[in-house]
Curated annotation (Swiss-Prot):
Monomer in solution. Oligomerizes to an active state in the presence of the positive effectors ATP and maltotriose. Keywords: Activator, ATP-binding, Carbohydrate metabolism, DNA-binding, Nucleotide-binding, Transcription, Transcription regulation. GO terms for biological process: positive regulation of carbohydrate metabolic process; positive regulation of DNA-templated transcription. This is HTH-type transcriptional regulator MalT. Residues 829-894 form the HTH luxR-type domain. GO terms for molecular function: ATP binding; DNA binding; DNA-binding transcription factor activity. Residues 853-872 bind DNA. Positively regulates the transcription of the maltose regulon whose gene products are responsible for uptake and catabolism of malto-oligosaccharides. Specifically binds to the promoter region of its target genes, recognizing a short DNA motif called the MalT box.
Length: 901
């Protein structure tokens, strides 16, 4: 819940001096990216900008305090301020900020700018007191903000010092409007106007000018002169002499003498007590100061000119001028030390009554009241956790003694979930074990079940599925239905374990249950996770169309709940890329993989390993080995500089082994095979993939017998567990083994099985990646004209893909190749004496690649009759009568040139 006063522009008071000369300068602010107003405290920065902002409807205002160094809090208020300025135009960004569903501040701002691209009118955001920001992450994000904000957007920053926002760069590019303390200082005319409005008796212009010079135009000093003159009934000139040459460091002494010592005791206590509030309203004042009518007292203090300012148009919220508020808080610690804890307790209670637990925690911490802090956390901690107020919660829990946590074990559970969210898995188990050992009496069964649900999540994250399953089952046996969050966690973990064990149908059922529960209780990250798992399971079962449709539901959920910046979004686009790759939609697959990398742009580079693997896969399917090698260099660098889950390594190894196969790099394959782990089982698609990598390397090295043993066992497991996509992949690799070992009939048999299974999976690229050996077999099958219609159609499609992406290596008779061929000493004499034209060589290459006459005509963009003429001519020159003879002739030429066909 946001405090309204932090988003309200200060109210313009009637007795303030209108700074016409500075307003004229600010009138051109829309021509600059940044308008920067800097000066020490008390020079009128806020007053000036509030005058300039008057009448501007499309302007947001954000008043900072020390608590805004929390990234999540900063983001929520900044987006809310822009929402006020735009009338709710940026709803997606607002939802992401409120639910903390963004990867970083920069990624949230990137989404904001996408929405603001549709906003075409001038727009302003004022950030007041930016000097309070000390968090370097926020500084970095605001530099990003300034670099990328729309041209019609102006950021206005008020600060006591030069902020770390890349000011020099903006200044050089003439994108910075600056107003500093020298310009903010009152001139003689403004000082005269000021005193005329504040003093009951007018003073001469010369005296006003002299006093202005004495304090160097410092607005706070002028205000103190007027206040002192009114309170003490002395001349303004006397006060001016006391203030001459004073600076902020000596201001405290002056404020004690001239302000605090000149108000009655009741007002003095009111000022000191109320100053602990960063913002205040009637209810807070009544509780903190004991005054019966807080609103009336605030208005009275305002009329006395005691540095109190309204923060909204309704006059409900107030705050002290920052310098005066800081001074009062310091005096409060000295003068009311014995009462200070009680004052903070009263503030915490009032904030709680108004529904602001974060502010209440701030005061409970300041009061050092562990019991109050505990009570606030017991009632509101889980809400704060779900809104990612993690830093505040961690600070609060550290402030509680361990004994207090033991007396309230749900707070121990909260601390453990905080550790889990930070991937501190070993600490989670240590904490829970210690708590169970030291909690006095019999531990509540439901709480124990919640502990087990969390432990189950930690176990599966840490790669221990057996322990995860045991704990998840224990949790589900004991958790009441009302404990929905822990039940969602335990059900999800159980489903994931069954996925790892190869029990796909039961795993799918549990993930569907998880989705239903998560949607019902608005636990959106688990709803998304369950959809991703369902899609993976359906892919493994060979139901790729069903997997596609599940992914569509996941994308819709991301859009509806603004989950675009969760790391899980990368998981979804990655499995979409895998599916697109399988269907040979390579451009779309590559785009999806790159969008996954973009989602992870603010994370460590190691997190991008899976998407980078897919980019290599796309290059390999296209036959672009140079690009694949470049990407592999980066991939192998990441592998050497991080620790990864076994399935991540298996996926990375897959593209490495395929690359070695395509380049004939037996040395690398042999070295890898010596060191790679050999899993004990192959009962899920992760382990199947690793064993398939091993078999592929063995085939490359000519180790056909051990490779066949591996593949036959993989097929047996895949059939029993219904891992149909893995079975399809295994059959293709077994086909290559039979083909290379000369067992042509066996090769044809398993290829027919693979083609039939592909009717279900839709696989294309898995065939294409095997290159010319696959193309030769498919040509033979097509020419036999015995394939069923669907298999015939798929075989032709695969041949076209191989021809498109691999023709340059095998079947593309370009000019350079033909020139080398004609100069070869073993070239047939018939070709040397009756050479083919360049077009006839192209036609021969396409015939060899399995193209029909119509397809050749389409490829070369000529009439079918022209193709028939070319074919008749090249048959005559080659001395052949039939198409199959031409294919065999082309194959002999390629072999002669050293191509392994």
């Amino acid at each position: 819940m946001l405090i309204p006063s932090k988003l309200s522009r200060p109210v313009r008071l009637d007795h303030t001096v209108v700074r016409e000369r500075l307003l004229a300068k600010l009138s051109g602010a829309n021509n600059f990216r940044l308008a920067l107003v800097t000066s020490p405290a008390g020079y009128g920065k806020t007053t000036l900008v509030s005058q300039w902002a008057a009448g501007k409807n499309e302007l947001g205002w954000y008043s900072l305090d020390e608590g805004d160094n929390q990234q999540e809090r900063f983001a929520s208020y900044l987006i809310a301020a822009i929402q006020q300025a735009t009338g709710g135009h940026c709803s997606t960004s607002e939802a992401m900020a409120q639910k903390r569903q963004y990867a970083s501040l920069t990624s949230l701002f990137a989404q904001l700018f996408i929405e603001l691209a549709q906003w075409h009118r001038p727009l302003y955001l004022v950030i007041d007191d930016y000097h309070l920001i000390t968090n370097p992450v926020i500084h970095d994000a605001m530099r990003f903000f300034l670099r990328h904000q729309p041209e019609n957007f102006t950021l206005v920053v008020l600060s006591r010092n030069l902020p770390q926002l890349g000011i020099a760069n903006l200044r050089v590019r003439d994108q910075l409007l600056e107003i500093g303390s020298q310009q903010l200082a009152f001139n003689h005319q403004e000082a005269k106007q000021f005193f005329d409005r504040r003093l009951s008796s007018p003073i001469e212009a010369a005296e006003s000018s002299r006093m202005c010079d004495d304090v160097a135009g410092w607005a706070t000093a002028l205000q103190l002169i007027a206040l002192s003159a009114r309170q003490n009934h002395t001349s303004a000139h006397h006060s001016a002499r006391r203030l001459a040459g004073i600076n902020a460091s000596h201001l405290s002494d002056y404020l004690v003498d001239e302000v605090l010592d000149n108000v009655d005791v009741s007002t003095r206590h009111f000022l000191l007590k109320s100053a602990i509030l960063r913002s205040m309203n009637d209810a807070l004042i009544v509780r903190v100061t004991g005054e019966e009518n807080g609103q009336m007292r605030l208005e009275e203090i305002e009329r006395q000119g005691l540095f109190l300012q309204r923060m909204d148009d309704t006059g409900e919220w107030f705050s002290y001028h920052p310098s005066f508020g800081s001074f009062l808080r310091q005096r409060c610690q000295w003068e009311l030390a014995a009462e200070l804890s009680e004052i903070h307790r009263a503030a915490a209670e009032s904030w709680m009554e108004q529904g602001f637990p974060s502010e209440a925690i701030h005061h409970a911490l300041a009061a050092g009241d562990a019991q109050m802090l505990r009570d606030i956390l017991l009632n509101h901690a889980w809400g704060l956790f779900n809104h990612s107020e993690l830093a505040l919660l961690e600070e609060s829990l550290k402030a509680l003694p361990w004994e207090s946590l033991l007396e309230n074990p749900r707070l121990v559970l909260l601390q453990a979930w905080l550790m889990q969210s930070q991937h501190r898995y070993s600490e989670v188990n240590t904490l829970l074990a210690r708590a169970e050992q030291e909690i006095k009496g019999v531990m509540d069964g439901t709480l124990h079940a919640e502990f087990n649900a969390l432990r189950a999540q930690v176990a599966i994250n840490d790669g221990n599925p057996e322990e995860a399953e045991r704990l998840a089952k224990l949790a589900l046996d004991e958790l009441p239905l009302a404990w929905f969050y822990s039940r969602i966690v335990a059900t999800s973990v159980h489903g994931e374990v069954l996925h790892c064990k190869g029990d796909l149908s039961q795993s799918l059922s549990l993930m569907q249950q998880t989705e239903q529960m998560a949607r019902h209780h608005d636990v959106w990250h688990y709803a998304l996770w369950s959809l991703i798992q369902q899609s993976e399971i359906q892919f493994a079962q060979g139901f790729l169309q069903a997997a596609w449709e599940t992914q569509e539901r996941a994308f819709q959920l991301i859009k509806e709940q603004h989950l675009e910046q969760l790391p899980m979004h990368e998981f979804l686009v990655r499995i979409r890329a895998q599916l697109l790759w399988a269907w040979a939609r390579l451009d779309e697959a590559e785009a999806s993989a790159r969008s996954g990398i973009a989602v992870l742009s603010t994370f460590q580079p190691q997190q991008q390993l899976q998407c980078l693997t897919l980019l290599v896969q796309c290059s390999l399917a296209r036959g672009d080995l140079d690009n694949a090698r470049s990407q592999l260099n980066r991939l192998e660098n990441l592998l050497g500089n991080g620790r990864y889950h076994c399935d991540w390594i298996s996926n990375a190894d897959k593209v490495r082994v395929i690359y070695w196969q395509l380049t004939g790099d037996k040395k690398s394959a042999a070295n890898w095979l010596r060191h790679t782990p050999k899993p004990a089982f192959a009962n899920n698609h992760f382990l199947q993939g690793q064993w398939r990598n091993i078999a592929r390397a063995q085939i490359l090295l000519g180790e056909f017998e051990p490779a066949e043993i591996v593949l036959e066992e993989l097929n047996e497991n895949a059939r029993s567990l219904r891992l149909m996509s893995d079975l399809n992949r295994n059959l293709l690799l077994l086909n290559q083994l039979y083909w290379q070992s000369g067992r042509k009939n066996d090769a044809q048999r398993v290829l027919l099985d693979a083609l039939q299974l592909a009717n279900r999976t839709g696989f294309i690229s898995h065939f294409v990646i095997e290159g010319e050996a696959m193309a030769q077999q498919l040509r033979q099958l097509i020419q036999l004209n015995t394939l069923p219609e669907m298999e015939q159609h798929r075989a032709q499609r695969i041949l076209r893909e191989i021809n498109q992406h691999h023709r340059h290596k095998f079947a593309h008779f370009d000019e350079g190749f033909v020139e080398r061929l004609l100069n070869h000493p073993d070239v047939p004499e018939l070709i040397r004496t009756s050479p083919l034209t360049q077009r006839e060589w192209q036609v021969l290459g396409l015939i060899y690649s399995g193209y029909s006459n119509e397809q050749i005509a389409g490829e070369l963009a000529v009439a079918a009759t022209t193709i028939k003429t070319h074919i008749r001519n090249l048959y005559q020159k080659l001395g052949v009568a039939h198409r199959q003879d031409a294919v065999q002739h082309a194959q002999q030429l390629l072999k002669m040139m050293g191509y392994g066909v």
